[in-house]
């Protein structure tokens, strides 16, 4: 077996998706604890308590002024090397979150068992559907009172349109949470409270009919036997092929805060989740075992510190191997670059990367030349596909305090849109500039960066725009007619792509009915 194949086979690259407050940060913590990356997990407490989560723990790096928001954490587990990509929480939610999902091979979906499927989870699952990403599910917060577990699985199946196969099943919940039954191993793992900061030695009872179970949990033993008869009759069995096709999700129950059940998920990810997969380019499919290096940029982390203009581009390695000091070909620019200072993120600490393999994420210092979707190779003219732009969900008109700086404003907005910080739209019929974003924080960041980096002071105004769609049509004549009749709703984005700006969803739906030959797209390839 080649050295590269051994390294590829070891890797599992996944992201955690959840609604805010479902426990994603706590799970990230505990996952790192099991990966020996942390000795004692720091629970996410109120910010005043001084005990911050390790994945929220990097203050802005003082010397470079870059915040890397622990976007990537790499750690060993059971003979595998796991790359966990963090998706930002509600405060800094942006398109970055969506695009991070294009750089992983599987996802862990975390659901608050008291609340069930929530809005952000629905949105993120839509994005995983673009590539049929395999999903592992964790029903969290069993140490609180929860909804009926069968009802929770039913909701996942109906709302997210994915079959559920329980792997573990809860025994009690809240103050009466006793542990879980592992359906595939035929064993009960008992829960001990107050062990959240360390890896606990769990008590395992083999077999549901074992008298030790009755001795350990009393009347709950009979209840769980009865309940499991119903569960086994009403639920799906785990099927690896369906899981890898993104059609079925294995479901685990536990409490991240109590550090119970997290190792069960990791066991499942290492055993079943795909190793780094082949990636499509415009020319051919790139296999991870290919000898020559290739990778693509899926995220650019801009500094939030006006004193520094440096940023880091996050690259997923797709084939070959990165070695310190190697020469890479930046395909879009047609230029070769020597890369000697790429970063790796072992358990959240930034280190210089000496070597990286397919599935790994490296950070490249970017002085404004890299864009999202850029491909790097060892000379081959490839371009990876499947790194999309998403239609924004919030819009503002942006206006200058000094009208003479229109040129600088446009330049700044176009550059920031290339970097993925925001999207900009120029209506065809007016001189307005409309900024679109997925998260509210993006607007604030853009105004701050326009001021510090482009010396432009701008303010936002409300605008009646509900959504945007990129428009295409194979028939040039029909497209021209559409442009003429709908010009008041049309704009060009930062890359000069034609976009329909809809004041309401009703307006969009009417236009789609009226012009059936025009394609209105929610996403656009970078």
From Swiss-Prot:
Q: Using the record's annotation, list all stretches that form the tr-type G domain.
A: 9-277
Primary location class: cytoplasm
Per UniProt, what is one GO molecular function of this protein?
A: GTP binding
UniProt-listed GO biological process terms: regulation of translational termination
Q: Which UniProt keywords apply?
A: Cytoplasm, GTP-binding, Nucleotide-binding, Protein biosynthesis
Entry-linked Gene3D superfamilies? P-loop containing nucleotide triphosphate hydrolases, Peptide chain release factor 3, domain III
List locations, semicolon-separated.
Answer: Cytoplasm
Q: Where does the UniProt annotation place the signal sequence?
A: none
* Positions contributing to GTP binding: 18-25, 86-90, 140-143
Mind telling me which CDD domains this protein's record contains? RF3 (cd04169), RF3_II (cd03689), RF3_III (cd16259)
A GO cellular component term found in this entry reads: cytosol
Pfam families in the record, alphabetically?
Answer: EF-G_D2, GTP_EFTU, RF3_C
Give the matching PROSITE patterns: G_TR_1, G_TR_2
Which HAMAP family does the entry link to? Rel_fac_3
Which family, according to the similarity comment?
Belongs to the TRAFAC class translation factor GTPase superfamily. Classic translation factor GTPase family. PrfC subfamily.
Q: Which PANTHER family match?
A: PEPTIDE CHAIN RELEASE FACTOR RF3 (PTHR43556:SF2)
Q: According to its UniProt entry, what is the function of this protein?
A: Increases the formation of ribosomal termination complexes and stimulates activities of RF-1 and RF-2. It binds guanine nucleotides and has strong preference for UGA stop codons. It may interact directly with the ribosome. The stimulation of RF-1 and RF-2 is significantly reduced by GTP and GDP, but not by GMP.
Under which name does UniProt file this protein? Peptide chain release factor 3
């Amino acid at each position: 077996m080649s050295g590269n194949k051994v390294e590829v086979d070891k890797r599992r690259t996944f992201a955690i998706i959840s609604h805010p407050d479902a426990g994603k940060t706590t799970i990230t913590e505990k996952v790192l604890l099991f990966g020996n990356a942390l000795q004692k997990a720091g629970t996410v407490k109120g910010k005043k308590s001084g005990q911050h989560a390790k994945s929220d723990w990097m203050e802005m790096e003082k010397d470079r002024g870059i915040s890397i928001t622990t976007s990537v954490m790499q750690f060993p587990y059971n003979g595998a090397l796991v790359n966990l990509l963090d998706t930002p929480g509600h405060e800094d939610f942006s398109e970055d979150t969506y695009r991070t999902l294009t750089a992983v091979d599987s996802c862990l979906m975390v659901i608050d068992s008291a609340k069930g499927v929530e809005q952000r989870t629905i949105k993120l699952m839509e994005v995983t559907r673009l590539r049929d990403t395999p999903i592992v599910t964790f029903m969290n917060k069993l140490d609180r009172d929860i909804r009926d577990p069968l009802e929770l699985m039913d909701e996942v199946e109906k709302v997210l349109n994915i079959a559920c196969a329980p792997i573990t099943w809860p025994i009690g919940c809240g103050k009466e949470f006793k542990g879980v039954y592992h359906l595939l191993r035929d064993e009960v793992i008992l829960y001990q409270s107050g062990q959240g900061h360390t890896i606990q030695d769990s008590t395992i009872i083999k077999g549901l009919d074992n008298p030790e179970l009755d001795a350990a949990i009393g009347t709950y033993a009979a209840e769980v036997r009865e309940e499991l008869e119903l569960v086994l009759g009403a639920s799906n069995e785990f099927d690896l092929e369906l899981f890898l096709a993104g059609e079925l999700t294995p479901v685990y129950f536990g409490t991240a805060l109590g550090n119970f059940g997290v190792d069960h998920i990791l066991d499942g990810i290492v055993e079943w989740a795909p190793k780094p997969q082949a990636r499509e380019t415009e020319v051919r499919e790139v296999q991870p075992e290919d000898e020559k290096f290739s990778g693509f940029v899926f995220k650019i982390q801009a500094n939030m510190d006006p004193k520094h203009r440096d940023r880091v581009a996050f690259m997923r390695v797709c084939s070959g191997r990165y070695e310190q000091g190697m020469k890479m070909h930046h395909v879009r620019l047609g230029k070769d670059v020597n890369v000697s200072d790429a970063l790796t993120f072992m358990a959240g600490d930034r280190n210089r990367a000496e070597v990286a393999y397919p599935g790994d994420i490296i950070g490249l210092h970017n002085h404004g030349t890299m864009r999202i979707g850029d491909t790097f190779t060892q000379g081959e003219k490839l371009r990876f596909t499947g790194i999309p732009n998403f239609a924004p969900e919030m819009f503002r008109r942006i206006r200058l305090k000094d009208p003479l700086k229109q040129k600088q404003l446009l330049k700044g907005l176009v550059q920031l849109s290339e970097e993925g910080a925001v999207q900009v739209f120029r209506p065809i019929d007016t001189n307005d500039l409309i900024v679109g974003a997925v998260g509210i924080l993006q607007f604030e960041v853009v105004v701050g960066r326009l001021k510090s980096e482009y010396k432009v002071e701008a303010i936002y105004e409300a605008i009646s725009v509900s959504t945007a769609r990129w428009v295409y049509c194979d028939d040039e004549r029909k497209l021209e007619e559409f442009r003429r009749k709908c010009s008041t709703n049309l704009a060009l984005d930062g890359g000069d792509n034609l976009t329909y700006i809809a004041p309401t969803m009703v307006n969009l739906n009417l236009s789609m009915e009226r012009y059936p030959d025009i394609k209105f797209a929610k996403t656009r390839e970078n």
